Regions:
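Active-site anion/phosphate-binding pocket segments in diverse small-molecule metabolic enzymes
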Residues: 2, 8-12, 104, 207, ...
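Residue-level preference for long, well-ordered alpha-helices that form the structural scaffold
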Residues: 7, 14-17, 183-190, 222, ...
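Active-site-proximal beta-alpha core segment in soluble small-molecule metabolic enzymes
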Residues: 34-207, 229-232, 237
Length: 248
């Protein structure tokens, strides 16, 4: 079809460029043994999900409707995080999501039993894997503190002071998301701050999710720095590593 024949308005996607980016992400998965998830709030053109699913491990969502989209259109690993969940939404999320991440221990306590019993209502008969979002209180962003998850008075994630080791039973993963269109050196800085405060708990976990904001496919991205960090984590702690790039 010629450009002049396209119905307008419409979205036009360069499949070759998308595949080039996906190949970079797939190589990272294969070389380092990590898992890449599509952050749907950044890119949710579901007509491309079957193609994207050929290269990466799955999707991550910020609520029920994105979770449905990933479950129905890609059908691979399906993760979700939200600052708070409605009980009605949680009843469906435990059926369609593999990982559910809570913003606080209060939210986890509220839905712990529902997650624990989730195998009874899931097609795969496997219980949901539960995670807690962490605020490592390490800001690497400048100029827009109001949007910074580690900024003053942020309520995104659990700080070291708020962490409840006594409530870790049933928690299988930790998650932090602090970056926005940033390079690997900022991720290293963030992880080092996280490790200093929370690293001891990783020995009790099955996975670590380092969120999104990684410009992995950008030309000047420090890919070798990222690989070195992932290898260090996997060699030091008994956890699977997840990343959630969106724009990349």
């Amino acid at each position: 079809m010629m450009w002049k024949d396209l119905p307008t308005p419409c979205y036009v996607v360069d499949e070759g460029k998308i595949r080039k980016n996906l190949e970079i992400l797939a190589d990272l998965e294969q070389e380092c043994g990590c898992h890449i998830l599509l952050a749907q709030k950044a890119f949710s053109m579901y007509s491309l999900y079957p193609m994207i699913g050929q290269y990466i491990s799955g999707t991550t969502a910020s609520g029920l409707y994105e979770a449905r989209l990933g479950y129905e259109e890609m059908g691979k690993e399906n993760h979700v995080f939200a600052p708070a969940y409605k009980e009605k939404d949680m009843e469906e999320l435990v059926q369609i999501c593999d990982h559910i991440i809570f913003n606080s221990f209060a939210q986890y306590e509220k839905y712990k039993e529902m997650c624990r019993e989730s195998a009874k209502v899931r097609k795969d008969k496997k219980a949901v894997s539960v995670g807690i979002r962490i605020n490592p209180q390490c800001s690497t962003q400048e100029g827009h503190e109001i949007y910074d998850p580690c900024g003053y008075a942020s309520r995104l994630g659990v700080t070291e002071e708020q962490f409840r080791e006594d409530l870790l039973e049933g928690v299988e993963g930790l998650h932090f998301h602090t970056l926005c269109e940033q390079n690997a050196d900022d991720l290293v800085t963030t992880f080092q701050a996280f490790e200093k405060k929370f690293g001891k708990y990783l020995y009790r976990m099955k996975w670590l999710n380092m969120g999104g904001g990684h410009h992995i496919t950008r030309e000047n991205y420090q890919i070798e720095t990222l690989k070195k960090l992932i290898r260090y984590i996997r060699e030091t702690y008994p956890v699977e590593v997840y990343l959630e790039p969106g724009e990349a």
